[in-house]
UniProtKB/Swiss-Prot annotation:
Keywords: Chloroplast, Isomerase, Membrane, Metal-binding, Plastid, Repeat, Thylakoid, Transit peptide, Transmembrane, Transmembrane helix, Zinc, Zinc-finger. InterPro entries: DUF5351, HSP_DnaJ_Cys-rich_dom_sf. The gene is LQY1. GO terms for biological process: photosystem II repair. Binds 2 Zn(2+) ions per monomer. This is Protein disulfide-isomerase LQY1, chloroplastic. GO terms for molecular function: protein disulfide isomerase activity; zinc ion binding. It is a single-pass membrane protein. Its sequence is related to the DnaJ family but lacks the J domain. The CR-type-like region is similar to CR-type zinc-fingers and was shown to bind zinc. The lineage of its organism: Eukaryota, Viridiplantae, Streptophyta, Embryophyta, Tracheophyta. It comes from Arabidopsis thaliana (Mouse-ear cress). Interacts with the photosystem II core subunits. Interacts with HHL1.
Length: 154
């Protein structure tokens, strides 16, 4: 007995629904199609993965817009407040002790044989202190975004 080949499976798509059949009663003057013509109707079904993907996309866009707006409002509010916090490195004085002469203004060099030479500090020009690099001498702690580039005084 000969074995027949199986027929190919009928293609099925979840997006194509049963075709619409037009009957003479559904035919009206505004519908110009012939009654025997039928077209497939497309329907969309959302599976849970698609719903999750769309939700994540919408949430990402909302956060992408919301976070910068939040930061801008915080910056604006901080700019309106008065800043009276004393500078931390200089304790509000606006000057820091020179690290080379340790605030004395003089540098002592031992030449040997018991001889010493005392000269003015070349870092602070004998003043013993330098302008604070954090507050630029104002004595007020700058806000984070107002800080200048750090200048190393060594």
């Amino acid at each position: 007995m000969p074995v027949s080949a199986p027929s190919p499976p009928r293609l099925h798509s979840p997006f194509i629904h049963c075709p619409i059949n037009f009957t003479p009663s559904s035919f009206s003057a505004r519908n110009l199609r012939s009654p025997s013509t039928s077209y497939p109707r497309i329907k969309a079904e959302l599976d849970p993965n698609t719903v999750v993907a769309i939700s994540v996309g919408v949430a990402s866009v909302a956060l992408g817009i919301g976070i910068p707006v939040f930061y801008e409002t915080q910056i604006d509010n901080a700019a309106k407040r008065e800043n009276t916090q004393p500078c931390f490195p200089c304790n509000g004085t606006g000057a820091q002790k020179c690290r080379l002469c340790v605030g004395s203004g003089n540098v002592t060099v031992e030449l040997g044989g018991g001889e010493k030479e005392v000269s003015n500090c070349i870092n602070c020009d004998g003043a013993g202190s330098l302008t604070c690099t954090t507050c630029q001498g104002s004595g007020v702690q700058p806000r984070y975004l107002d800080r200048r580039e750090f200048k190393d005084d060594d």
